[in-house]
Amino acid sequence: MTITDLVLILFIAALLAYALYDQFIMPRRNGPTLLSIALLRRGRVDSVIFVGLVAILIYNNVTSHGAQMTTWLLSALALMGFYIFWIRTPRIIFKQRGFFFANVWIEYNRIKEMNLSEDGVLVMQLEQRRLLIRVRNIDNLEKIYKLLIENQ
């Protein structure tokens, strides 16, 4: 096993750990989930570049008769990238005392002001940061509003 294979295993393990945390552990942290809303995906250009580069590496490894283990590891990395970038849906998860947005826990008392833009983006101003929440279904903004009013 080469250093390349070890690095690939490390990256695959990191992506797998992130996927498991995002899918199974995060919804169970900090109490029961009150509301989970699907968000719009960000630009997919980065993901296309990543998966495309891994596909080029697979092609290069196969045509130069590289190690079969490396080909399998590159394929696993491409599949993990495909899952994380295209199959997994980003979500905002509301709990009793706060919410998870982009895998970061934010307590409700940190929200200084909220606005709704004309194009349906909920803007939450924190102490030093502004969150732009783009929901997939515009009707979910009303659910978020009701939940925040109940918990404030």
Swiss-Prot record:
InterPro entries: DUF986. The lineage of its organism: Bacteria, Pseudomonadati, Pseudomonadota, Gammaproteobacteria, Enterobacterales. Keywords: Cell inner membrane, Cell membrane, Membrane, Transmembrane, Transmembrane helix. Pfam families: DUF986 (PF06173). Belongs to the UPF0266 family. HAMAP family: UPF0266. This is UPF0266 membrane protein YobD. It is found in: Cell inner membrane. One of its GO terms (cellular component) is plasma membrane. The gene is yobD.
